[in-house]
UniProtKB/Swiss-Prot annotation:
FMN binds at residues 198-245. InterPro entries: ComplexI_51kDa_subunit (IPR050837), Nuo51_FMN-bd (IPR011538), Nuo51_FMN-bd_sf (IPR037225), Nuop51_4Fe4S-bd (IPR019575), Nuop51_4Fe4S-bd_sf (IPR037207), SLBB_dom (IPR054765). It is found in: Mitochondrion. It comes from Schizosaccharomyces pombe (strain 972 / ATCC 24843). This is NADH-ubiquinone oxidoreductase 51 kDa subunit homolog SPBC18E5.10, mitochondrial. One of its GO terms (cellular component) is mitochondrion. One of its GO terms (molecular function) is 4 iron, 4 sulfur cluster binding. Keywords: 4Fe-4S, Flavoprotein, FMN, Iron, Iron-sulfur, Metal-binding, Mitochondrion, Oxidoreductase, Transit peptide.
C-alpha cells in the first residue's frame, strides 16, 4: 500500500535528492552524456565550466544569424522536455516570424526558462539547477540569440532555495566574465538574465499562468499557448522553454544536429532525464536515450521493481498526466513521445512512478485527485467540480466498495474530448488518469464495484 501523501516512496525520491545517484547513460552513441555533472556532482564554478568546454565558441555563436541557430535546432528535432513535447525549433521560428513585423522590431522579445517543476514525481530539474547551472545559462544565451531577445527570466520553484542561491552565484560569475549583460564577449549583443522565484503554486507550471505570475498577477491560465509567442510577458513576444530543453541547446549548436539525432529515433531524438520513483529498489534520475524500453529502464537502471518484475501492476510513465499503463503495456512500450501517444499516454516530464500492488493504483489516483482539488486554479468545470466530485468514488474503488452509479457518473464527467472546455493541459490530466484505469484495468474496476 502507498502511504499518506503521494506515498513515502515518492517522498523519499523528492526529499532525498542529495543522495540520489544519477545512473549511467543508456544506449547513447559512444556513451556521451548531455549532462555529465549530474553524475560527477562537482561544484560548478565558472572557471571549472570554462575548463570543461562550456561557453566554448560562444563569441562565434553570438555572431550567427538567428535563423541559422533556429535551423540547427529544427534539424536536431529537439522537442520540449516539459510536458507537451512541442518542437523547439518551430516554437523559435514562430516567434522569430512574429517579431519580423513592424511591431516586432520595436519590441524586443523575452525568453522564459521554466524551472517551476511542480509536477508530482518530477525532480530532474532540481538536479539540473544544482549540478549543471552553466549549461542552463549558456542554453539561455543561445535561445535568446535565436529570437533576438535582450532579457531572460529563469523561473524557479519557490522552495528550491539552495538551487536558487547557487544559480544566482553562477549568474554573477557569468556577468563578471562578460557572458551576460551589455556587449556580450565584445559583441553588440546584450542579455540580462534574472531569477524569479515561483509562486509556490502547481498551476504556475502552465505557460500562461507562469507569465501571469511573473507579472505579479494571480496565476490563472487564460492565454492560448500560441498567443504567448506574440503577446506574452508584459505584452511582449515571449518564448517559454523548459529548463531541460534549454540545457540541450549548447550541445546541439556546438556538435551539430547530426550528433543529436544519432540518439533516439525519428521525431524522438536525443537523451531524456527520467525521474524514477515509487516501488523500485533504486529511486533516481536517469539520463537515457529517447526510445529506451520502459522495462529496460526499470530493470537495469532503477534496481528493478520491489519484489521482482512479476510483482509489477502498473506504471505512470510520464507522471499522473500520462495515465497509468498495465504490466503488458509496460513490457512493450518504449519511452518516447510517439510510442506512448499510441497507447493514449504521454511522456510528460518523464516522471516514472512504479506500482507493485493493485490497491496502489486507486490510492495513488485518490492522492492525485486530492492534490489537484487544492492546487489547480478551479476555473474550468473539470478541475473545479469534476475532480472534487470523483474523490468519494475513488475512495470507494480503493476500499473495494464503489457503487455502479458513482462509476457511471465519474466516467461521464471525464468522457469529453481531450482539451474540451478547458483553458490548459492540466484539465486533461485527471481525464487521462480516469480513462486509463477504465481502459487498462477493467477487471479491477469490476472487482471493486458493488452492483447494487
Amino acid at each position: 500500500m502507498l502511504s499518506r501523501g503521494h506515498c513515502c516512496k515518492l517522498k523519499h525520491s523528492f526529499n532525498g535528492l542529495r543522495n540520489v545517484a544519477l545512473k549511467r547513460l543508456v544506449g547513447s552513441k559512444a556513451g556521451y552524456r548531455m549532462f555529465p555533472n549530474l553524475i560527477e556532482k562537482r561544484i560548478r564554478r565558472i572557471d571549472d565550466a570554462l575548463a570543461d568546454g562550456e561557453y566554448e565558441n560562444l563569441s562565434e555563436i553570438l555572431k550567427y544569424d538567428p535563423l541559422n541557430i533556429i535551423e540547427l535546432v529544427q534539424e536536431s528535432e529537439l522537442r520540449g522536455r516539459g510536458r507537451y513535447g512541442f518542437p523547439t525549433g518551430e516554437k523559435m521560428l514562430s516567434l522569430y516570424k512574429a517579431t519580423s513585423s513592424e511591431r516586432g522590431r520595436k519590441e524586443k522579445p523575452v525568453v522564459i526558462v521554466n524551472a517551476a517543476e511542480n509536477d508530482i514525481g518530477s525532480f530532474k530539474d532540481r538536479l539540473l539547477l544544482r549540478h549543471e547551472p552553466h549549461k542552463i545559462i549558456e542554453g539561455a544565451i543561445i535561445a535568446a540569440r535565436a529570437v533576438e531577445a535582450s532579457a531572460c527570466y529563469l523561473f524557479i520553484r519557490k522552495d528550491y532555495y539552495e538551487e536558487t542561491v547557487m544559480m544566482q552565484k553562477c549568474i554573477i560569475q557569468a556577468y563578471a566574465k562578460k557572458l551576460l549583460g551589455k556587449n556580450l564577449l565584445g559583441t553588440s549583443i546584450g542579455l540580462e538574465l534574472l531569477i524569479h522565484p515561483g509562486a509556490g503554486s502547481y498551476i504556475t507550471g502552465e505557460e500562461s499562468a507562469l507569465i501571469q505570475s511573473l507579472q505579479g498577477e494571480f496565476p490563472v491560465p487564460d492565454i492560448p499557448i500560441n498567443n504567448t509567442i506574440t503577446s506574452g510577458l508584459f505584452g511582449l513576444p515571449t518564448l517559454v522553454l523548459n529548463v531541460e530543453t534549454v540545457s540541450n541547446l549548447p550541445a546541439i549548436i556546438k556538435k551539430g544536429p547530426k550528433f543529436f539525432i544519432s540518439m533516439g529515433r525519428p521525431n524522438n531524438r536525443g537523451t531524456k532525464l527520467f525521474s524514477i520513483s515509487g516501488e523500485v529498489n533504486e529511486p533516481n534520475v536517469i539520463e537515457a536515450c529517447m526510445s529506451i524500453p520502459l522495462k529496460d529502464l526499470i530493470e537495469n537502471y532503477a534496481g528493478g521493481v520491489r519484489g521482482g518484475w512479476n510483482k509489477l501492476v502498473g506504471i505512470f510513465p510520464g507522471g499522473p498526466c500520462s495515465g497509468i499503463l498495465n504490466k503488458n503495456q509496460c513490457e512493450q512500450v518504449t519511452m518516447d513521445f510517439d510510442s506512448l501517444k499510441a497507447l493514449d499516454s504521454s511522456l510528460g516530464t518523464g516522471s516514472v512512478i512504479v506500482l507493485n500492488d493493485h490497491d496502489q493504483i486507486f490510492e495513488s489516483l485518490l492522492n492525485f485527485a486530492k492534490f489537484y482539488s487544492t492546487n489547480t486554479c478551479h476555473t474550468c468545470p473539470v478541475c473545479r467540480d469534476g475532480v472534487e466530485d470523483v474523490i468519494e468514488t475513488l475512495k470507494g474503488l480503493k476500499d473495494g466498495h464503489a457503487h455502479l452509479s458513482q462509476l457511471k457518473d465519474m466516467f461521464s464527467k471525464f468522457n469529453m474530448p481531450s482539451s474540451s472546455k478547458v483553458f490548459c493541459g492540466f484539465g486533461d490530466s485527471m481525464r487521462h488518469q480516469i480513462h486509463s484505469i477504465q481502459r487498462n484495468f477493467p477487471d479491477q474496476i469490476t472487482f471493486r464495484t458493488k452492483v447494487t
